[in-house]
Amino acid sequence: LDRLGGSFFIKEMTMNKKSYSILAVAIAGSMSLAACGGGSSDDKGSSSEGGGKGGTLYYLSKRPAEHLDPQRMYIGRDLADMGRLTYRSLVQMPVTEDAAKADKPVADLATDTGKMSDGGKKWSFTLKDGVKWQDGKDITCEDLKYGLSRSFATDVITGGPNYALGFLDVPQKDGLPVYNGPYKKAGQADFDKAVACDGKTITYKFNKAWPDFNLAAASLRAFDPYRKDQDKGDKSNYAVFSNGPYKLQGTWQKGKGGTFVRNENYDAKTDGVRKALPDKIVFQEGLTNEVINQRLIADSGNDKNAVTDRAVPPSMYGQVTGKIADRSTNPQSPYVDYLVPNFKKMTNPKVRQALLAATSQDAWIKAGGGDKAYTNAYSIINPALTTAYAKNPAFKYGTGGNIEEAKKLLKEAGQPNPSIKFTYSGGTPTSQKQAAALKDTWEKAGFKVTLNELTDTYYDVIQNPNADGDIFWGGWGADWPSASTVIPALFDSRINLTAKSNGQDYGNYKSDEVNKMIDEAAKATSVDAAGEIYKKIDKKLGEDVAYIPLESQKFYLLRGSNVTNYIDNPATSMYPDLGSVGVKK
């Protein structure tokens, strides 16, 4: 998941003749691990007073939902929200603040968390009895199969994750699956062999080990059921057909929002995850960050019952004191911001090493709002990914940088004053201050720096292999709690670098050694075993200065005084967990 300046942007999966390149989601005030709680910033952020059923909860946001179709959703906030309200999965991430539990899936529509066999190349799940759609009809194994089949119709069902296209044991021709989804007839028999139903049991067969498949199924909506008679192709984008505790009342209006009310055919006895406390949840889109947070600070009328995904702007930090601070939360997010040298231009390894030495995380963080906005980062892998995270020893110059060492390295490189251009996502006073802070530290080391601020669009620009820049800014968060959704997506040159795009490998980095280790990690039959390999890969990336970590983002969120049961749950990317939250009546 890409992170981009306070809002999410979908990056559709692109397929080339060789592979699938995951152009995941951009993140904002945030994909997919982290935000919210109660009390002051030194508590756990939970607010558990009250907690009974009833009342109306309001969700205030700026960014409109781009997709509510489960197979097209790929934004952390929306995946979390709809997974709690309308879309149930075979397995689901739990409602908890305990990080040790938040990354372990629990049964939802299925009777358990799945049975893995054949070294991780086969998974089976059995549906519970009594799980129904909003019209009272039973959810069937065929509904699960049909839902996944839609992901293969990449000309119709766009924007969502396409992991299934690369993992399912469906034959390929010219690098692409022979199956093209349910709207065409080609390859149906091949898909039927890879995804098979036997009564209430569904079995998935993969072409390689996928030991954390149940994590993917719990974190993404791509594997959720979808009823064939409700499918209108790309016209289903905002047509929510629920099997969860809530259903959409009327229609969803992009840019304005919609209202969810209780689903009378939902049986809470079949659901051990969601509390489903409010009677009604009203989403209001199109509000600015400043307006949202000013309303939450004022705490009047319906805003007393409101939550948000929009962080408090640094200019308002001084207003969040006393009882207002008691309604704030400041948890760690799943997102890491970083820099990538352009290997097409910055070819001298000593110059890249000098750039690393001259980079001050501390200056960047201070310019961006300080410790309420960020914490220092020591790897591109977020600490929440406990099986793969370790402080990268290659980043040895401290969070404040080492100007004298940088000068020494530039002298050794024979380039004491190299000219560099920093391309970054801008358009806000904060981003401009942060870029200026880096420029200052780099120039102290001897670099001659030009700032290249992009305001209207960003990732599609830097994904051009010939993009203008020596250094690019980037931000990323895991699709589910596994480094397999971080390292390969960003640094496997085989799935990223083509004549027309560098995918997420914005710096055009290419290493046969790294690619070989990525293959070794993919063959691992456990998440722990793969994690040890990813630690070695990360060390190699650091030694090559394939990236420079800047910080790990934090969320600074307010809520209304009537909101109850508010928790900071890594499983919902630290956005308000709608499976827990309620309102005082």
Where are these regions (language model features)?
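Periplasmic-binding protein-like
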Residues: 69, 329, 344-386, 434, ...
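Extracytoplasmic/peripheral linker and loop segments enriched in polar/acidic and small residues
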Residues: 193-195, 451-459, 488-561, 585
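Gly/Pro-rich hinge or "lid" segments in bacterial periplasmic/extracellular proteins
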Residues: 95-96, 205-276, 280
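N-terminal lobe/hinge region of extracytoplasmic solute-binding protein
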Residues: 60-118, 241
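Extracellular/periplasmic solute-recognition and catalytic clefts
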Residues: 249-261, 282-344, 367
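Long beta-strand-rich cores associated with HINT superfamily self-processing modules
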Residues: 557-585
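Surface-exposed binding/hinge segments that line
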Residues: 126, 145, 150-226
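Structural transition elements
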Residues: 372-412, 427-433
